[in-house]
Amino acid sequence: MKKLMLAIFISVLSFPSFSQSTESLDSSKEKITLETKKCDVVKNNSEKKSENMNNTFYCCELCCNPACAGCY
């Protein structure tokens, strides 16, 4: 009976969700970097304002990432 309980105990400890992790989980040491991408499709040309707006919307659809800069 003791051998059976020991075998069950060891098998339960072998699962990663039940066993204790030896690594420290200090999140303050991890650095998070955010990337921002500049939208290059839009050109600063006052003559083609409607075309620039279409290009801006097209850029936003391409970018799809809220971290992208340059979308209005």
Swiss-Prot record:
List locations, semicolon-separated.
Answer: Secreted
Keywords from the UniProt entry:
Disulfide bond, Enterotoxin, Secreted, Signal, Toxin, Transposable element, Virulence
As for what it does, the entry says: Toxin which activates the particulate form of guanylate cyclase and increases cyclic GMP levels within the host intestinal epithelial cells.
> A single GO CC term, please?
extracellular space
InterPro entries this protein is in? Answer: Heat-stable_enterotox_CS (IPR019806), Heat-stable_enterotox_STa (IPR001489)
Name of this chain's protein: Heat-stable enterotoxin ST-IA/ST-P
Disulfide-bonded cysteine pairs: these are: C59-C64, C60-C68, C63-C71
What family does this belong to? Belongs to the heat-stable enterotoxin family.
